[in-house]
Amino acid sequence: MKIVMLDGETLPLSLPTGQIQADWEIRPQTSANDVVPALTGATVAITNKVALRAETLEKLPELRFICVAATGYDCIDLDACRARDILVSNVPGYSTQSVSESVIAAIFALRRQLMAYALNTRIDWPQAAHFCLHRQTIQDIAGATLGIVGKGDIGQAVGRLAQALGMQVQYAERKGSDRIREGYVSFEQMLATSDIISLHCPLSEQTRQLIDRQTLSQMKPHAQLINTARGGLINEDDLAAALKQGVIGGAALDVLSSEPPTADNPLLADLPTLLLTPHIAWASRSGVENLVSGVMTNIAAFVQGQPVNLVN
């Protein structure tokens, strides 16, 4: 059996390939043009973000199993996999703790103006007239309202941590829904009443560019936006404009629509109220270890004829 990982460099820990008897190939990265040659003859493909679409899958008759080394699997054409009887598994829950803690860290950074004051300290404090600097307004976390979009494992974990800090937590119903489920508020109410909004929903045709000029204009003027889910949830041109114009108070993003971003991405501009990190909210040591373990568990289960964590 041939097993190929297409983007091994995305994992800071190596897969313990000796646990499963197979012909392993761990490729650092694989361009779109090289996917078919790389997977020719392979029974199992492992991918973190390398896309596997219908036009690629039809050229790989021996491929039987795809393990996505992540929780989100929007890089896989599930319909094409079903048509070709290719099983697909993901690794759910591996980063729940890491991502939820990253969100709380972002809330502190934004509300307490840590980025701005770190800069002020070096430039202005030595010339200050007294013991402290008063520049940007600092806001408390306790008592603030956190709106969460997506009530999966990570969304609920963020909610629990936020409540422990004294925050008021509300979960948004799906945009455009005519029915509000128990435990939710309407999407529009969440926008209008939240001090911080954190995105934790999958990327789909229904959620693509969920946050755009219109939704940004419905948020509180001081509200702050956090996205650790998928970059495509946000219209990046609209967000950059909103931050420049002060439509909202700030944002913290760990994901962008294209990764790595192109140099002309508007969110790479000088935006003092934006905290941008390179898709590492998931990557605590324990998060990475959980992911590696989950990948190996999925492959072992497939080899034994009892696949787990199937998404198709």
Describe the role of every protein-language-model region:
Residues 92-145:
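Phosphate-binding beta-alpha-beta segment of Rossmann-like dinucleotide-binding domains, i.e.
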Residues 1-42:
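N-terminal glycine-/charge-rich "phosphate-binding" loop or analogous flexible N-terminal tail
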Residues 151-152:
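Glycine-rich Rossmann-fold phosphate-binding loop(s) that bind the pyrophosphate
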Residues 102, 222-312:
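Rossmann-like dinucleotide-binding domain for NAD(H)/NADP(H)
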Residues 28, 69-70, 86-97, 173, ...:
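Short beta->alpha connector loops at strand-helix junctions that form conserved
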